[in-house]
Amino acid sequence: MQQYLDLLAHVMEKGSDRGDRTGTGTRSVFGYQMRFDLGEGFPVLTTKKLHLRSIVHELLWFLKGETNIRYLKENGVSIWDEWADENGDLGPVYGAQWRSWPAPDGGHIDQIANLVKGIVNNPNSRRHIVSAWNPAEVDQMALPPCHCLFQFYVADGKLSCQLYQRSADVFLGVPFNIASYALLTMMVAQVTGLKGGDFVHTLGDAHLYHNHFDQAKLQLTRRPKPLPFMRINPEVKDIFGFTFDDFELIGYEADASIKAPIAV
């Protein structure tokens, strides 16, 4: 994906060196946007191999509304381990906000169910929005949401999604986020009877950690390969009915993975 390599090069060449919460140091830019046409293939990096299993299981975990890493651990996914407490809990992170946002009357709002219903019943609405940024609960979260708000848009029988990501770890996080929200868009499109349109990724603080520079330079020497295609089980018509086996990535060829430390 040339769009991602362009982002990587832009941050390396134009970014400002700044301190950060982790003490690692970053080079960052503020405000950057990428667009991916889902009709051209599934936007997963080919200049380094990604662990698709982690991406799919994390998304299913979000959609379950869960905030304990037990499900992830049972399925061989360790990407949230560093932030969980001794019981595996993370506080009211993504799943809680997506599926169980606290309402003033003591009840809860299922933003995902409302989203799907809204797309079906009023596709032209400009209110197809899900937010994970809850100011009343952000201090209770092990890690405040980085990808914090997304909006869907219907036109010409296609469903597009725009994500706003306040904090974007360009080397480790962003490739996962692109694939995750592209997949979510395809899933929502299927259950609402639409085709996949564009995934638009808008970044706030887009940063490369200083200890990722060598890895970024290596990746920039590689050339993108043709995108694979994601096959989704067409029998699934409920957004909460998907399982891992409903997804098959066809034709994925990628260069070797590039290891890099996580800044916690």
From Swiss-Prot:
Gene3D superfamilies: Thymidylate synthase/dCMP hydroxymethylase domain. It catalyses: dUMP + (6R)-5,10-methylene-5,6,7,8-tetrahydrofolate = 7,8-dihydrofolate + dTMP. The keyword Transferase applies. Pathway: Pyrimidine metabolism; dTTP biosynthesis. (6R)-5,10-methylene-5,6,7,8-tetrahydrofolate binds at residues 51, 169, 263. Keywords: Cytoplasm, Methyltransferase, Nucleotide biosynthesis, Transferase. It comes from the Bacteria. Transmembrane segments: none annotated. It is found in: Cytoplasm. Disulfide bonds: none annotated. GO terms for molecular function: thymidylate synthase activity. The active site is at 146 (nucleophile). Pfam families: Thymidylat_synt (PF00303). GO terms for cellular component: cytosol. Its EC number is 2.1.1.45. GO terms for biological process: dTMP biosynthetic process; dTTP biosynthetic process; methylation. DUMP binds at residues 21, 126-127, 166-169, 177, 207-209. The keyword Amino-acid biosynthesis does not apply. InterPro entries: Thymidate_synth/dCMP_Mease, Thymidate_synth/dCMP_Mease_dom, Thymidate_synth/dCMP_Mease_sf, Thymidylate_synthase, Thymidylate_synthase_AS. HAMAP family: Thymidy_synth_bact. Belongs to the thymidylate synthase family. Bacterial-type ThyA subfamily. Homodimer. Catalyzes the reductive methylation of 2'-deoxyuridine-5'-monophosphate (dUMP) to 2'-deoxythymidine-5'-monophosphate (dTMP) while utilizing 5,10-methylenetetrahydrofolate (mTHF) as the methyl donor and reductant in the reaction, yielding dihydrofolate (DHF) as a by-product. This enzymatic reaction provides an intracellular de novo source of dTMP, an essential precursor for DNA biosynthesis. This is Thymidylate synthase. The lineage of its organism: Bacteria, Pseudomonadati, Pseudomonadota, Alphaproteobacteria, Hyphomicrobiales. The gene is thyA.
